[in-house]
């Protein structure tokens, strides 16, 4: 952003009084790093700490941020404010030092709310689909020439980053319900994609508490704001009478204000018609597979239509949509040397989905787009508590693939729970009689086990939210070699 653009932005968005140096504890996370990137581009001095470098910290370093790969008290002593990730505990030495020095310590969402305070905020919430929907809204606004600021939980491929500072009044952001911190946000427009029982430790195991929290989030909208909600979701349909704001619904349902009709899929593209409240139609080609992505697009179109964005810009953005990292992320089609000496090709897809509903949507999208391919899934369960709470759903959904290789549970800091481990889950799936899952307890054995499982012309789904994304890249870079045409 040049000096003239920054000056224009300053006329829209005032500086935070007395704040010059902002320190982030846990800066390597996508959400934290995205906010840090926007603030760095606004001219604030940025520092932060994390345990190891990654793409997020590398990008921030290029922008002039000081990154420490350790947690020490001295890291925060010159900061005006400390922003803390929800993964950081209160006994972290930087948090303790900040409190001792009377430096304000705030959560990530509080800083996001501050960015949103003087902007036209569009917040995307829901159990599933937040990241992709945020990217779709961003893509449409960018295509329309509105140059929005955005902060997303996943890398927006078209932009090559999780976040970017725009020159307009629009801020598009993913809103995180996992720790209820989205209640800090006060947007003008809020999308809710769906509501399911997840992160229930935050809500004391009470689903009614979770539902009421979403209603409270929507009531942060001004009375002239807009709630955009998926009416296909049974919980959202139940909650509609309790939402005291203007509502636009979307979905496949006949009574949706923005209705998806005639969906079909060819490869990675979805084709469908959107029927809007004013009876106008949009014939959409969406460069993202699956009925769930058609719903995400309908939400984005509802917001864009309300803003008055031209239909042609909407259609161009959706047809050119490049997606986000680790959301049905096509890593290439590669030749394979199989153990029987034959050759073949495998399509490699990396996907972040780690809840049964998300995994089911990925499987359905793969089946619809590539009906002749076998589905070979490498799955890493995420958290023992989620595996325990959704055990039967996982067993059902994972039984739908043709071959399943299951890694050990990615604990995310949790202690093991008896009966909520990968071995138990494999045993239960095997007992259903559809497939015989392969338990992978040693990652070094995975390439050989995968070679034995593949027949050629397969579709490999690398699925999960832990460190399995690194495995997908490793497979793409080493085990599977790109075909070289002569």
UniProtKB/Swiss-Prot annotation:
GO cellular component: cytoplasm
Disulfide bonds: none
Gene3D superfamilies for the chain: Mur ligase, C-terminal domain (3.90.190.20), Mur-like, catalytic domain (3.40.1190.10), NAD(P)-binding Rossmann-like Domain (3.40.50.720)
Reactions listed under catalytic activity: UDP-N-acetyl-alpha-D-muramate + L-alanine + ATP = UDP-N-acetyl-alpha-D-muramoyl-L-alanine + ADP + phosphate + H(+)
EC class of the enzyme, as a word: ligase
One term of GO molecular function: ATP binding
Highest taxon of the lineage: Bacteria
Pathway info: Cell wall biogenesis; peptidoglycan biosynthesis
Family label: Belongs to the MurCDEF family.
NCBIfam families reported for this sequence: murC
PANTHER family per the UniProt record, alphabetical: UDP-N-ACETYLMURAMATE--L-ALANINE LIGASE, UDP-N-ACETYLMURAMATE--L-ALANINE LIGASE-RELATED
Protein name as it appears in the record: UDP-N-acetylmuramate--L-alanine ligase
